[in-house]
Amino acid sequence: MKIHYGPVTELAVDAIVNAANTQLRHGGGVAAAIVRAGGRVIQEESDRVGWCDLGKAVATTAGSLKARYVIHVPTIDYKGGCRASLDDIYRGTKAALELCRQLALKSAGFPLLGAGIVGVPPREVAEAMARAIEEFPDVECTLCAFSAADREAIEGLKER
């Protein structure tokens, strides 16, 4: 597992992972940054997909990003008023990596899913995601540290 200090949108990987909402409306946080960087086509394709449950993942084009795909992993359901649990984050990370396998992708970049707007503690997120990532040694994964708290959480994984 690699560490990148900066936005997930900077990565040259096969897929970047988006901390989405279940409605796939990319209006804030990392989701909005991905659409700004990759273009409106990401939101348009997400609109056609329409929905993704917590703990699941769906792929869309990456527009003009360096990646080939954006894999959307919901961390919040505004309609139902629920935020992702650590189990949802673990299952969503696994679902994203299963999609990587299905699409024959060799690399993926992840923000700390749920550690931003959703407010799940970054250290707990990093640990849940690392557990899932360890199950997919065939996909080279990069965790992105966007904030000081993210950086501390990801670097804490080295102590495991």
Regions found by a protein language model. Give the residues of each.
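Glycine-/small-residue-enriched capping loops at alpha/beta junctions
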Residues: 1-86, 90-103
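Phosphate/ribose-phosphate-bearing ligand recognition and processing surfaces
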Residues: 77-160
